[in-house]
Structures are given as C-alpha cells and as structure tokens.
Amino acid sequence: MSQQIQTFSISAPGFFGLNTQDSPLDLNAGFALVATNCIIDQYGRIGSRKGWSRVNSSSGNLGANDVKVIHELVQADGTLTVLFAGNNKIFKLSSTNTVTELTYGGGGTAPTITASNWQCASLNGITYFFQSGHNPLIYDPAVSTTTYRRVSEKTGYAATVPDADICISAFGRLWAANTTSVNSTVYFSDLISGHVWSTGTAGSLNVNNVWVNGADQITGLAAHNGFLFIFGKRQILVYQGATAPSTMSISDTVEGIGCIARDSIQTTSTDVLFLSNSGVRSLMRTIQEKSAPERDLSKNVRNDLMGAVAGETLSNIKSVYSEREAFYLLVTPSIDTTWCFDTKAYLPDGAARVTTWDSITPKSFLSRRDGSLYIGKTGYIGYYNTYQDYDTSYRMLYYTNHADLGDQNVTSILKKLSAVVIGGTNQVVTFKWGFDFKTNYLSDNATIPSQGVYYYGIAEYGANATTISYYSDGVALQTLVVSASGTGKVVQTGYESDINGSALSIQKIEIQAKQGKLS
C-alpha cells in the first residue's frame, strides 16, 4: 500500500536565531544553522536586514580610507554635528552632508596624528577626542566650527589632561583611563569642564588595590543609573554614588569576566552590553538589590564568535546599540562578519537571538539622536535605511537545523517544499535541501512575482495561533512551492534570495514527505 504524504510545518522559522553551539539534532525547530544577512523582524520572523546608502556623495580629503569613528555632538540649542575620523584626520559633515576637514586652530604647532582610533565624548557643547599616544583634542563650535585644538589650548585649562585611550562623558564630567604609563587609574574632570583636571571637583581613582581577582588593567568605562562601571580584562568594578566622585564607593564586583574590547561597550536603557573573554555579556542592573548578575547573550554562537575574535586586533572591533532597530551589532572585521544580537526579546536561558551579516563591511557605527544608524565605510558614511548595499544586491540565507521527520529510524522521501514569504517582488527564492548532514544540496527555484501594495492579516501564521499584528507596511504575502526529491533519515532545508530593493521575511515553512524504509 502506498504511504500517505505527511506535512511537517515550521511556523515562525528562525524565531530563535542561530544556534551553532549545540547538537543540531537536539535543537528546537525555531533555531537556524545559517542566518546570513538576516534579522528577526518585529513580528518574530526571519527576514532580510536593511542595506545602506551613502550620506556623503564624495570623500574629500578622507579619500579611500576607512571611517574609523563617528560621533554626534548635540548642543544645548539643538544643533547636531556629525564628526568623524579617518586618514589620520578629523572631519565633520556640513549641513549638506559635504565632507569638511577640520584643520588645526590652536595657534602653535599642530599635533601629529598617526591613527584614527579615537574615543569621543561630548560635554557642555564640546566634543573631546582621546586616543592612546596622542594629545587629547577638542572641537568647540563656540570658538570655531572649522578647526580643532588640543584640550590644553582651551582657555581656562588646568592641570594635565591624561593622554588616555578611554573616555566617557557621564554625570556632568569626563572620565578617562588607560594612559601610556598608568592603566589602573580613572581620572575625572571638574563638573561641566572637560578641560579642568586639578581644581574644583576634579580628581582620580586608583583601583590598583581594589581589583578582587588580582592585578588587572582598565579596558573600558560605562555609566548607568548613577553607577560607574570600571572594566578590567577579567573583572568589573561597580561604583555607586558616581554623581559625587569624592564620596563614591564600591558597590559590587564581577570576578572572572571583564571587557576585552573598548568599543564593544554599549549602554542601553536597561543594560550595559560588552564583549568579554567568553562572549557578549549583559550586566543587568537591579538597583534595589545592589547586584549585577551577568548574562551570556552569545551562548548559542559562542565558539564561532570567539573563534572570530581570536583572529582580531581588538581595537578594530566596533559595536553599536540601536534603539530604533532593537539590536546590538558587533563587527569582527578580519572575517567581514557583523554579529546582530536582537534585543526585543531574549530566550528563556537569557541568550539573545543572533544572526550574522557578511557583506555590509562596517568600520565604525553611530546611532544618532533621531534614531538613524550610520555606518563607517571606506571613503563614506553609510545610512542603514534601504534594501540595497549602495545600489548593489546582497544575498539572504536561512537554513534550518537538521531534523528527522517524525521517526529517526525511518527514511523520509521528500515530495514538496513550500514557504510563505512576505515582501519581495520579481525575485527568485532558491530552495535547497539535503540529507543526513551532507552539504551536497539539491535545489530548485521559485519566483516571487512583481507585486503592488496590499494589506494582509497574519494571524493564521502567528505563534500559538494568535494575532501578532497586521503588516501595516502593505507588503504582499506569497506561498512559494517547489517539487523536492531524494531520501534520508535527517533533513535540512535552506532558503536563499538576492535582496535588491525590497524587504523579505519567511513566515512559514512546510515539508511534504512520505515514509520510506525502516532502518
């Protein structure tokens, strides 16, 4: 007797993000083994990331060099200025997004700039630039909108500004650390005066004897909810009362975990995210309990991530938190991989839903005051806002985990694959399928037709059969079907498409198969 065709469904495929850490046979169907150039969209579907368009039309004196840092100065009157560095120079974007080089305006001999790995911080309408081995610099638009100077050349300068590699602006002052000669002292400026380092309420905090896990060095600083976080390589110190530095005190410590990359630290409304020696971590503040439990966001991709980090120059690792996009991005540039950690919702074990991007090639990031996301590129600043990488398509890939279709002792005979997709227009989706952990996939193509704007309710495919929302962007839904063939005990399917101007998400997958021989 002929076996009946059975249908196996995956609703909200890829909802849990990547999992390359655990055995693929033990994974929930919501995990992905490949999710390249993907995000988890606002409805919990695996979907295409956005691309980028150029903010500046020409490079000016930046030339074909990387934009290593981007910073936004927000002044009291609401004036916004985008500052950036590359080619051992400092630039700003004009009101028409023209690249304008800032020249030295201090009146003496111009400082020698040999790198562009600045950490920027703004205080009282002035942006400060700190970088190891360099004189700290300032851009003060109240004095000049076309020049920079040394901090030491500002009127009212007092004491010696530390030649630090780390600087943040918090609680109305600058905090700096890790000079060429001292790596265990935090220096803080006077209130509202980033050029005053000895009088008023300025001072320093030596933590050399405070480290609880042996000698360490400061690798980063962060501030949150009145607390100052001092990151070492293998430990973290948490100081309370940082609004009044003279009386602040140690509140908590985290041992065995620290920060290994200065520019991986990002503060959100509730967390401080950073790259540790074992992955991306989140310090969850519970102010009432004065505790700081840590959480491993990269648990499901830890080995892959840390393998990538091992081959990096740590100062080249950059990150950003985007409140609008609800993700934390971390780039490992040597392998051209951007790790996207979704922050809309975490998995039950505290891990984040992770996807990767492989062709956008960020050199730096900026999340602007208005929520827009800027990306440092070679010769340009990119704006994350379109579904092309500067007029070029990019390929989205999603592959399921390996799974038996009901009985691991029975061979499955594939008959048909279908995918419900939302978005896309006039583009090919390549279906791939393979058996028993082999990568010699079979494939077939289905085409999303040219389509206009429609409105669809998506409750039919919502998790737990509940209404998630309406796709208010008016993007059409299509069911794509291909005939499949081949047999195996364990099946994996994949879905690839070139993104070229239109968003694409996968809402549901169905696999039709017959049972074969018992083995």
Language-model segments: residues:
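Beta-sheet repeat architectures centered on beta-propellers
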Residues: M1-T100, A110-T127, G256-D271, N277-S519
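A short beta-strand motif characteristic of beta-propeller blades
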Residues: W52-L62, T100-A110, T147-Y157, S204-W211, ...
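Hydrophobic core segments of beta-strands in well-ordered, beta-rich domains
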Residues: V82-A85, F129, S169-N178, G220-G232, ...
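Structural signal for beta-propeller blades
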Residues: I90, P136-L137, N183-T185, I236, ...
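Asp-box/WD-like beta-propeller blade repeats and closely related beta-sheet repeat scaffolds
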Residues: D140-S169
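Solenoidal tandem-repeat scaffolds enriched in leucines and small polar residues
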Residues: C167-T199, S204, V212-D216
